[in-house]
């Protein structure tokens, strides 16, 4: 899917329509020092199996896109609706 690099859309911070730069956000590495991760490591210690049941069903073949729209006037970024699934994604001029 080809998507424009710049798009004119509503900015909830400026409260008007402005030009936005489209950014694709990549997944960052999990923080090992977060409270949830520390709790999980504590549960994994010692004897016994994995503390959670195996997930039911299968994993989806494609992850959902995370697009951020950054306003050129105020510089703040926001999302627009939920992400959508697409195999190939490309940002193009226009």
Curated annotation (Swiss-Prot):
Q: Membrane-spanning regions, if any?
A: none
Q: Which SUPFAM superfamilies match?
A: Zn-binding ribosomal proteins
Report the stretches of sequence that form zinc fingers (C4-type).
Answer: 11-74
One of the record's GO cellular component terms: ribonucleoprotein complex
- Kindly list the cofactors needed: Zn(2+)
| Positions bound to Zn(2+) | 11, 14, 71, 74
Enumerate the InterPro entries for this protein: Ribosomal_eL44, Ribosomal_LSU_eL42, Ribosomal_zn-bd
Q: Domain of life here?
A: Archaea
Q: How is the cofactor bound?
A: Binds 1 zinc ion per subunit.
Gene Ontology biological process terms, A to Z: translation
According to the record's subunit comment, the protein's assembly and interactions are:
Part of the 50S ribosomal subunit.
- Name of this chain's protein: Large ribosomal subunit protein eL42
Task: Please tell me the species this chain comes from.
Answer: Pyrococcus furiosus (strain ATCC 43587 / DSM 3638 / JCM 8422 / Vc1)
Q: What is the lineage of its organism?
A: Archaea, Methanobacteriati, Methanobacteriota, Thermococci, Thermococcales
Name of the gene: rpl44e
